[in-house]
Amino acid sequence: MATIGALVLRFFFIAVLMSSQKSWAIKEEHTIIQAEFYLLPDKRGEFMFDFDGDEIFHVDIEKSETIWRLEEFAKFASFEAQGALANIAVDKANLDVMKERSNNTPDANVAPEVTVLSRSPVNLGEPNILICFIDKFSPPVVNVTWLRNGRPVTEGVSETVFLPRDDHLFRKFHYLTFLPSTDDFYDCEVDHWGLEEPLRKHWEFEEKTLLPETKENVVCALGLFVGLVGIVVGIILIMKGIKKRNVVERRQGAL
């Protein structure tokens, strides 16, 4: 794959909630992260704000538009997209300088970990969402394809932006709405520069195997039979013990 130069700027702002008590003891701590990057040769960037690991908003660089993770957030705050565009321009200029100073040495590739799971317990015929969680990777470039029965799916898919981690790696979520069926199976295929080949994670509906009633009856009858045998054997051993003791007592009486 093509060589990549990546500049990732992360600014951490710690908002500390102080107790109103006289001791002013720290009761809780929250973190707001402003994460931005610019990538080459893709010539694209990302600008977003994160609160305690959840996205607040990101800026669509191409559309110069602020996209709030939840629409309700826009009622209480605002952010001018032009500010993000100005930051990305600075990132690009800094990246050019860093490329020269590093003799065009690319950043290291860290392959992702991939997990596929459902949003909620799966029941046949009830709509659900599959989640493809891509974690601990760098640089922030991945190609993700959903497959149903081995064929690409493009409808009902969505995704998050690249989300920062405390260790300067990234994570990302991809979603697929689906109707659970025993006839369908799904795969999330992830391609990243840290992988030798695309990585697939498989998911299919697994029906809970309940013990048939006939088998239950057999097992119950077998258990009852074993119990009865144990009781009979126990009674026989007790009778033999009593008989043996009586014989010994009669012999001792004769003496």
From Swiss-Prot:
Compartmental location: Membrane
UniProt domain Ig-like C1-type: residue ranges: 112-204
Stretches for region Alpha-2: 110-203
InterPro entries: Ig-like_dom, Ig-like_dom_sf, Ig-like_fold, Ig/MHC_CS, Ig_C1-set, MHC/Immunoglobulin, MHC_I/II-like_Ag-recog, MHC_II_a/b_N
Residues in compartment: Cytoplasmic: 243-255
Xref: Gene3D superfamilies: Class II Histocompatibility Antigen, M Beta Chain, Chain B, domain 1 (3.10.320.10), Immunoglobulins (2.60.40.10)
Identification of the protein by name: H-2 class II histocompatibility antigen, E-K alpha chain
A Pfam family it matches: C1-set
Entry's family note: Belongs to the MHC class II family.
GO cellular component, as recorded: external side of plasma membrane; late endosome membrane; lysosomal membrane; lysosome; MHC class II protein complex; plasma membrane
TM spans (from-to): 217-242
Region annotation Alpha-1: where it falls in the sequence: 26-109
SS bond list: 132-188
Topological domain spans for side Extracellular: 26-216
Gene Ontology biological process terms from the UniProt entry: antigen processing and presentation of exogenous peptide antigen via MHC class II; immunoglobulin mediated immune response; peptide antigen assembly with MHC class II protein complex; positive regulation of immune response; positive regulation of T cell activation
Signal peptide: 1-25
Biological source species: Mus musculus
Annotated spans, Connecting peptide: 204-216
Keyword line: Adaptive immunity, Disulfide bond, Glycoprotein, Immunity, Membrane, MHC II, Signal, Transmembrane, Transmembrane helix
One GO MF term attached to the UniProt entry: peptide antigen binding
Residues that carry a glycan: 143
Membrane topology of the entry: Single-pass type I membrane protein
